[in-house]
Every structure is written in C-alpha cells, then in structure tokens.
C-alpha cells in the first residue's frame, strides 16, 4: 500500500498526478487526511480521502508520499503524529517520497543527511546535510525519493513507479 498524506493547503497536482500514475501501475494507493473525510488544497480543490491518518498501517506500507504546498507541508510538520509515523516508517525501511516543499520535512528530521535530494529551488537550504541536485526533477537515494517542483509531478510519479515496480512498469505507465 502507498499512502499519500494530505494536509490542508497541499498542492493538488503534486498529490493527484503521482496518485494517478501509481494506480495506473496497479499499486494500491490511498489518499490520507489528517482528520475528516475531505481535504482542501492550496488552490481550493477539495479531495475525498480514502483514509484518516489513524488508519495508516505500516505493516502493509510500501511507501509514504508527502506532496508539497507550503501550507500543507507546515500542517504536516505541526502534527506530531506525522513526525512519529515518518520516523517509524524510516526505521522499518518503508520508502519515503516528498515533492517540492515537502522534502524540507525529511531534511528537518535528518532523514536526508548524506543522501542525494532535490526540492523546490528556494528550499534547497532546508534539506539538512543532503547533497542537493538542483537541476534534478526526481531523485532516488536509498529508500528516499525527492522531487523538484509542481511541474515535475509526472517525473516524480514515474520515479515512484520505477522504484516500487521497476523501469519497465514506469515505461508502460508513461506510454499510456
């Protein structure tokens, strides 16, 4: 199961595009709200969540995805349950993926230290001790995937498919 964590103010395309590509690849993917059945993004688009945060089960998790959108990122940061979940997931070897502004969360938690990563350009300095690849659209290093910005949502989503199901699966989704 892939869990996409949504907090109020998330960037809609950064949640929807990767979710769509993951589902096209046959990966069970759930949109997860911090609370309540719906979550509104930074541009006023409201999504229906499949689950609430309390229903995330790391025993069946392949990956946790953190979309950007500064409001959503700050809401994720402010929720101690999210920090605990991410730390536990990292300890269990669950893939962690973050796009645009969201990699700063992984940086704040020290999870990118010594790893290659990217993020929204004005956030590069907030990636902890990561080796920043400023021109990269999507980067995987260990069990971490980071993405550049909203415009790289497709590249990021395809990278998620690639790390979970292989290059052939990513090519197949790209060719749909």
Describe the residue ranges of each PLM region:
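Short gly/ser/thr-rich secondary-structure transition/capping motifs
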Residues: 43-52
